[in-house]
Regions:
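Conserved glycine-rich cofactor-binding loop
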Residues: 11-12
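Short, small/polar-rich loop/turn modules that mediate ligand/substrate recognition or access, typified
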Residues: 80, 176, 181, 237-239
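Short C-terminal tail/terminal secondary-structure segment
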Residues: 94, 148, 209, 227, ...
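Substrate-binding pocket helix/loop in short-chain dehydrogenase/reductase
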Residues: 95-97, 101-107, 207
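Active-site helix of classical SDR
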Residues: 120, 160
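Alpha-helical segment proximal to the catalytic Tyr-Lys
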Residues: 125, 129, 173-174, 235
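Residue(s) in the substrate-gating loop at a strand-loop-helix junction
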Residues: 143
Length: 250
């Protein structure tokens, strides 16, 4: 039976790469996006070219009501949920810790932490064998910033991703007996559009001297890690925080 996957924030970057690779691996894919419908539809077109079903679903993950609608739309389009990639996230302009205001922090937490929490709840309710589901796999998108701290640029973002690590471990312990594996991927400096959101166009290149492999990563390399965690090859892995960093942070 064909498996189905829902990916939040899948119109660009890691989410889009994951959707395309999932299709190549035989998954039907729901492509969530917040604003860029054209980009989401381009990803949908690529999934369909691979011979898989795909639907774009608009929802701002930073709004709990929108998350609920997202999953209801998924139910109507696909039915059973087998894999959930909790990927949607935002990153603000680089700033010093003392210059970050509460409104900025709240925006980041609404999407990266609260939104991810609510979305993971919705996925778990559908997968849990205790609640009548058939089990499944959840991959939360964390960041190397969760352990590196984001100093001088993005402490608020790092804080939001540290919470994802904690949530992943707690979920893994609680949901294992209900047929759900929960893991996280922690990307390092990956060359995607979100890096430009900091206002530092060469952010990845500036970090290269700090990376043992002496290069930034690609969205496709992160997608490979996500799909491994989704596969039976990782069937005995839960609660894993998988670094995809080129060795940065060792």
């Amino acid at each position: 039976m064909t498996k189905t996957m829902l990916i939040t924030g899948a119109s660009r970057g890691i989410g889009a790469a994951t959707a395309r690779l999932a299709a190549q691996r035989g998954w039907d894919v729901a492509v969530n996006y917040a604003r860029n419908a054209a980009a989401a539809e381009a990803v949908v077109a690529d999934v369909r070219k691979a011979g898989r079903k795909a639907v774009a679903i608009q929802a701002d993950v930073g709004k709990p009501d929108a998350v609920a609608r997202l999953f209801k739309t998924f139910d109507a389009e696909f039915g059973r949920l087998d894999g959930f990639v909790n990927n949607a996230g935002i990153l603000d302009k680089a700033a010093k810790f003392v210059d970050m205001d509460a409104a900025r922090l709240q925006r980041i937490l609404d999407v990266n932490t609260v939104g991810a929490f609510v979305a993971a709840q919705e996925a778990a309710r559908r997968m849990s064998t205790r609640l009548g589901g058939k089990g499944g796999v959840i991959v939360n998108m964390s960041s190397a910033a969760a352990k590196l701290g984001g100093a001088n640029e993005a402490i608020d973002y790092a804080l939001s991703k540290g919470a994802i690590d904690t949530m992943t471990i707690g979920m893994a312990k609680e949901l294992a007996s209900e047929g759900i594996r929960v893991n996280a991927v922690r990307p390092g400096m990956i060359d995607t559009d979100i890096q430009r959101d900091t206002g530092i166009p060469d952010r990845v290149q500036r970090a290269v001297p700090l990376i043992p492999m002496l290069r930034g990563g690609t969205a496709e390399e992160v997608a490979d890690a996500v799909l491994w965690l989704m596969s039976d090859q990782s069937s005995y892995c839960t609660g894993l925080l998988l670094d995809v960093t080129g060795g940065r942070g060792l």
